C-alpha cells in the first residue's frame, strides 16, 4: 500500500494511533521509490538498510506525539553531507567520498525523527538549471519524462512531484529550489540568507547558497522549515535571529495585504501562457482581499550578468580544494604534481563546472577584477536597494518563477546563455538574500507553471500566509502527474 498521497500531518496521526508503524511506512516509501525510479532517476543512492534500521529504532522508542515529522522519510540533495553515506554533488571528482560528519541540517533532520531515505540527483556542484549537468544521469520531469525537471535540485523536486517521497531538501544559489519546484508543480522555498545553516553544504557560491525545503503543500513546507532553521556556531554566515513557528500565519486571511507586481517580471522573454496564468493568480489574490499594484525593479535586468560574475568567481575559489590529493577522484598516469592537478580536475569536473571556474578565474584576474567582479558587487547593491524601496510600501512581491515551462531534454544543452536566462526571475532574490517561494499556479501546454512570492528578510511567515491562502482557494496543488498514481 502507498501512503504518498497523505500529508505528514495525516501520516503523523496514523503513526501516533498505531494504525501504521514507522517501519511499515518506510517500506511503503521504498516501494514507491522502486516503482517510479526507472522513469524519474531522482535518486543517486537509496539508503534502504540504514532507513529500515532507523525506522525500527523509532518504533522501539515510540512515536513522539508532539513532533509531526517523527518517523517520516525524506530525500536529501547530494551536496548536503551525510555521515557514512556517499556524497558526490553528482560529480565524478567526488565519486566514492563518504563524509566523516553530518551537515547541521542532516543532524536537525535526525533530531526531528526524519529518516533520510537517500541522496538525490542534481546538476554537478549545483551548477545548472535543467538537471542535465549531473555526471551520473539526468533526472526526468515528473509530468513528462521527455522534459527537463529543472535544476540544480532536480532530484529534490522530481522525487516529491512523482510521489517517491513526501519531503526533500534542496539548495538554492540562483533559483535551484524554486525553478525545479515550478517545473514539477510543487512548493519550494529559498529561505532568507542565513536562516538555515550552510555547514556541511558543499559550497558553490558562499554569498548566495541556501538550503531549503521542497514539498507538495505549503503547510508541509513550513513544517520542514521549522525543523532546519536556526543559528549555528559552525556557520559564520548563520543568523542569530529568533526562529518563529512558520505555520503560525497559515489560515489567516490576506485582506488589505499589499502585493507588488514588478513590470520587469512580465516583459521580454516571458512566455505568454505563463504570463496569463500569473496575472490570473494576481487577480485571484485581489479577490481574496489583497491589494495588487504594479511597481518597478529597474536594476533586475542586470541580475543574470551580475550573478554569473559573482557566483562563478566564488565557485572558482571554492572548488580549488578539489585537487586529486586529499579525497575524491585522482587521475592516473601522471608525470608530476602539476600534471596531477590538471588531469584530476580536467577529468573530474564536467564541462559546465569547468566553464564556470574559467569564467570566475577570469573575473578575479588582475586585469578584470575592477571591471567585472567589483562592478558586479556594486550593481548587486543597486538590486538590493530596489527591493528595499519596494518593501517600504509592500508586504510581498509577486511574479512568475520561470519565464517558460519546462523544455525538452537536450534542447538547451549546447546553448548555455538560454539556460542561464531561465533563472532571470529567481536570481535577484539570491543576490538580495531575500526569502522566495514557488507554488503551483496553473498550467501551460499541460506543464506546471509556478508563481513566485518574494518576502522581506526573515519574513517567511507572510510568504506562507499568502501562499497558503492561494493554495486553499485553488486546486492546482491537487493535480498530480500520471506517474504519481502508479
From Swiss-Prot:
Region named Disordered: 131-159
Enzyme Commission number: 6.3.5.7
Leader sequence residues: none
Catalytic reaction equation(s): L-glutamyl-tRNA(Gln) + L-glutamine + ATP + H2O = L-glutaminyl-tRNA(Gln) + L-glutamate + ADP + phosphate + H(+)
Annotated HAMAP family: GatA (MF_00120)
PANTHER family: GLUTAMYL-TRNA(GLN) AMIDOTRANSFERASE SUBUNIT A (PTHR11895:SF151), TRANSAMIDASE (PTHR11895)
Entry protein name: Glutamyl-tRNA(Gln) amidotransferase subunit A
Amino acid at each position: 500500500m502507498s501512503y504518498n498521497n497523505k500529508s505528514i500531518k495525516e501520516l503523523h496521526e496514523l503513526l501516533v494511533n498505531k494504525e501504521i508503524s514507522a517501519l511499515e511506512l518506510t517500506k511503503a516509501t521504498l516501494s514507491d521509490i522502486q516503482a517510479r525510479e526507472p522513469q524519474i532517476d531522482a535518486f543517486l543512492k537509496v539508503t534502504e538498510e540504514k532507513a529500515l534500521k532507523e525506522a525500527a529504532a523509532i518504533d522501539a522508542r515510540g512515536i513522539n506525539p508532539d513532533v509531526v515529522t517523527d518517523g517520516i522519510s525524506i530525500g536529501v540533495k547530494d551536496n548536503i553531507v551525510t555521515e557514512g553515506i556517499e556524497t558526490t554533488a553528482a560529480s565524478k571528482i567526488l565519486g566514492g567520498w563518504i563524509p566523516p560528519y553530518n551537515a547541521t541540517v542532516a543532524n536537525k533532520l535526525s533530531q526531528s525523527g526524519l529518516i533520510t531515505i537517500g541522496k538525490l540527483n542534481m546538476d554537478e556542484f549545483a551548477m545548472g538549471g535543467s538537471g542535465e549537468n549531473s555526471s551520473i544521469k539526468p533526472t526526468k520531469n515528473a509530468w513528462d519524462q521527455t522534459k527537463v525537471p529543472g535544476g540544480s535540485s532536480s532530484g529534490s523536486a522530481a522525487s516529491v512531484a512523482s510521489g517517491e517521497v513526501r519531503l526533500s531538501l534542496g539548495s538554492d544559489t540562483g533559483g535551484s529550489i524554486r525553478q525545479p519546484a515550478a517545473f514539477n508543480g510543487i512548493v519550494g522555498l529559498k529561505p532568507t540568507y542565513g536562516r538555515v545553516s550552510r555547514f556541511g553544504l558543499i559550497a558553490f557560491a558562499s554569498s548566495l547558497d541556501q538550503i531549503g525545503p521542497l514539498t507538495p503543500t505549503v503547510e508541509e513546507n513550513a513544517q520542514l522549515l521549522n525543523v532546519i532553521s536556526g543559528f549555528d556556531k559552525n556557520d559564520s554566515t548563520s543568523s542569530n535571529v529568533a526562529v518563529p513557528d512558520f505555520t503560525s500565519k497559515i489560515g489567516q486571511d490576506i485582506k488589505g495585504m499589499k502585493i507588488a507586481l514588478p513590470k520587469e517580471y512580465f516583459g521580454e522573454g516571458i512566455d505568454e501562457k505563463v504570463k496569463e496564468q500569473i496575472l490570473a493568480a494576481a487577480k485571484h489574490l485581489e479577490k481574496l482581499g489583497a491589494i495588487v499594484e504594479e511597481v518597478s525593479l529597474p536594476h533586475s535586468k542586470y541580475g543574470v550578468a551580475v550573478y554569473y560574475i559573482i557566483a562563478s568567481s566564488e565557485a572558482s575559489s571554492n572548488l580549488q580544494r578539489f585537487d586529486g590529493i586529499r579525497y575524491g577522484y585522482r587521475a592516473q598516469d601522471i608525470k608530476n604534481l602539476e600534471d596531477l592537478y590538471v588531469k584530476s580536475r580536467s577529468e573530474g569536473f564536467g564541462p559546465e563546472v569547468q566553464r564556470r571556474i574559467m569564467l570566475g578565474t577570469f573575473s578575479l584576474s588582475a586585469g578584470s577584477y575592477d571591471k567585472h567582479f567589483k562592478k558586479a558587487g556594486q550593481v548587486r547593491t543597486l538590486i538590493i536597494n530596489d527591493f528595499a524601496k519596494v518593501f517600504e510600501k509592500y508586504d510581498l512581491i509577486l511574479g512568475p518563477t520561470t519565464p517558460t515551462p519546462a523544455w525538452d531534454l537536450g534542447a538547451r544543452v549546447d546553448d548555455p546563455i538560454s539556460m542561464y536566462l531561465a533563472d532571470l526571475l529567481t536570481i535577484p532574490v539570491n543576490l538580495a538574500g531575500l526569502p522566495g517561494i514557488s507554488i503551483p499556479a496553473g498550467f501551460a501546454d499541460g506543464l506546471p507553471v509556478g508563481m513566485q512570492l518574494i518576502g522581506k528578510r526573515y519574513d517567511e511567515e507572510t510568504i506562507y500566509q499568502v501562499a497558503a491562502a492561494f493554495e486553499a482557494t485553488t486546486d492546482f496543488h491537487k493535480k498530480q502527474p500520471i506517474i504519481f498514481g502508479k
